[in-house]
Swiss-Prot record:
Keywords, in A-Z order: Ciliopathy, Cilium biogenesis/degradation, Cytoplasm, Disease variant, Kartagener syndrome, Primary ciliary dyskinesia
Tagged with keyword Cytoplasm: yes
Keyword Cytoplasm recorded: yes
Family statement drawn from the similarity comment of this UniProt entry: Belongs to the DNAAF3 family.
Species this protein is from: Homo sapiens
Function: Required for the assembly of axonemal inner and outer dynein arms. Involved in preassembly of dyneins into complexes before their transport into cilia.
Protein name: Dynein axonemal assembly factor 3
GO terms for cellular component: dynein axonemal particle; extracellular region
């Protein structure tokens, strides 16, 4: 609902970046059982991880970059998102991170990563890279054999045929099938969304951004975010200004999402920006660092900004990930590369090759049906659930986690629109859902206001009932706004989609969109009953 003071929907209904620091998933998973059967093909123990709403791949990249510090394992990352644009961004970001160093240098790769990932506007060279890479991916998606040959780390086999078609359409839009900035006028869309969010406070938006930063984000542990960079992002959508401000003028099409809206009594397909305009992309890589000197203060003020810390962390992350390319090129010289990277222990295996991990994308809306497949039931050693997907934490999903497996739930700590009492209510609700799904709090887990950590109890929780939301639990409507609240007027959007572009998955009727989180969590268990499961290729999981 929109009020004169604004909609309060800064979180948006589509997530483009994470609202928590990147995790090393190996550090969060149970220790390797030495008696467990290793993968017969690769002769290494496997780590199977299911991630709901991880959005930007930061946890996966962090895990891969830290793999050299752990015994060698094969990773199977199963990623489930609620929109295909997020899947496409995963693929683009990973293809960039795994780009051959000979084709793109480390600095260029890190700068391109930051701009594509967190900026609403791009420099022309970065936009050209997005178009070229999107064109390549658009040709690979319909051809599984070529896709497996060129991107051996990627698996789309679980997606439905219509989802693959829609994914191809997303890449073709990014590649410039519809020419000109008028196809996605990002600056106008951003301003329209900001006006809708702030309402009568729009003219005082600088004061609003300073208040949100100092009284909310700084108080919650993100002191390194500088007022100038936060204000610039709130005004323009440009979080990482690595060049002169005039260089950023090409709309970032990877932030576009399609949707069916009601316009004068008719359903109209339109593209727009419905992502975050409140917190920003600074939290994922910008508020923590392995190098403690980046976080030091002088006269009570941080010496580095969140943008500078993000650039340093991403550069180091991509430097570590590039070891796979060198390992593949040099064949067997892994020991020398390990010592060159400075591993802490001589006996620790070197970083794995690209073929030692696979990213599997699961069909949209398949969380309630995964347990019907024997290949998923009790398979995963680690389950990660983002704060916007907590309503999917049900006993059926818990059945997919192996006994003794761990659960990590992202909390709403860095959501600007959430008040302190709402945070406490959300944390309580997370504990209730985790317990109903068969999990118990981890014993000895370090205290955290950002993540809730649980482990799978031995008893099955499939027969449990998720309790209804108690009257005292505050509603968290800002986590998943209905379309009427989160979308600006249709006149503020781009032109309607043309009939030649498939949009069956990215565009959803308002009745199919997620309601407020409290409404979803309060549904009786029968309303969440999964339909019958059919074949993966035709109907998905």
């Amino acid at each position: 609902m929109t009020t004169p003071a604004g909609s309060g929907s800064g979180f948006g209904s589509v997530s483009w970046w994470g609202l928590s620091p990147a995790l090393d998933l190996q550090a969060e998973s149970p220790p390797v059982d030495p008696d467990s059967q290793a993968d017969t093909v690769h002769s290494n123990p496997e780590l199977d991880v299911l991630l709901l709403g991880s959005v930007d791949g930061r946890h996966l990249l962090r895990t891969l970059s830290r793999a050299k510090f752990w015994p060698r394992r094969r990773f199977n990352f199963f990623v489930l998102e609620n929109n295909l644009e997020a899947v496409a961004r995963h693929m683009l970001i990973f293809s960039l991170a795994l780009e051959e160093p000979e084709k793109m240098g480390l600095q260029e790769r890190s700068e391109t990563f930051l701009e594509v990932w967190g900026n609403a506007l791009l420099r022309p060279p970065v936009a050209a890279f997005v178009r070229a890479q999107a064109d390549l991916l658009a040709h690979l998606v319909p051809e599984p054999d070529r896709l497996e040959e060129q991107l051996p780390w990627l698996s789309l086999r679980a997606l439905k045929f219509r989802e693959r078609d829609a994914l191809e359409a997303v890449f073709r839009f990014w590649a410039g099938g519809e020419k000109g900035p008028q196809a996605f006028p990002m600056s106008r869309l951003w301003d329209s969304r900001l006006r809708h969010y702030l309402g009568s406070r729009y003219d005082a938006r600088r004061g609003v951004s300073d208040w949100d930063l100092r009284m909310k984000l700084h108080d919650r542990g993100a002191q390194v975010i500088h007022p100038q960079e936060f204000r610039r992002w709130r005004d323009t959508g440009v979080a990482f200004e690595l060049r002169d401000s005039s260089a950023y003028h090409v709309p970032n099409r990877t932030l576009a999402s399609g949707r069916l809206l009601s316009y004068r009594g008719e359903r109209v397909a339109a593209r727009g920006y419905w992502g975050d305009i409140a917190t920003g992309p600074f939290v994922a890589f910008g508020i923590e660092a392995d190098d403690e000197s980046l976080l030091r203060t002088s006269n009570g003020q941080p010496v580095k900004t969140a943008g500078e810390i993000t650039q340093h962390n991403v550069t180091e992350l991509l430097r570590d990930v590039a070891a796979w390319g060198r390992a593949r090129a040099t064949g067997g010289d892994l020991e020398e590369q390990q010592h060159a990277e400075g591993s802490p222990e001589p006996g620790t295996p070197a970083a794995p090759t690209p073929e030692s991990f696979t990213v599997h994308f699961l069909p949209l809306n398949s969380a309630q049906t995964l347990h019907h497949k024997s290949c998923y039931n009790g398979r995963f050693q680690l389950l990660y659930v983002a704060c916007g997907m907590v309503h999917l934490l049900i006993p059926e999903l818990g059945a997919c986690v192996a006994p003794g497996g761990n659960l990590i739930v992202e909390l709403a700590r860095y959501l600007v629109d959430v008040r302190q009492e709402q945070l406490q209510g959300f944390n309580t609700r997370v504990r209730e859902l985790a317990q109903a799904a068969g999990f118990a709090p981890q014993t000895g887990a370090r205290p955290s206001e950002t993540f809730a950590r649980f482990c799978k109890s031995q008893e099955s929780a499939l027969g449990n009932t998720v309790p209804a939301v108690e009257p005292g639990t505050p509603p968290l409507d800002i986590l998943a706004q209905p379309l009427e609240a989160s979308n600006p007027a249709l006149e503020g959007l781009t032109q309607p989609l043309q009939g030649g572009t498939p949009h069956c998955e990215p565009c959803q009727l308002p009745s199919e969109s997620p309601g407020s989180l409290s409404e979803v969590l309060a549904q009786p268990q029968g309303a969440l009953a999964p339909p019958n499961c059919e074949s993966d290729s035709k109907t998905g999981v």
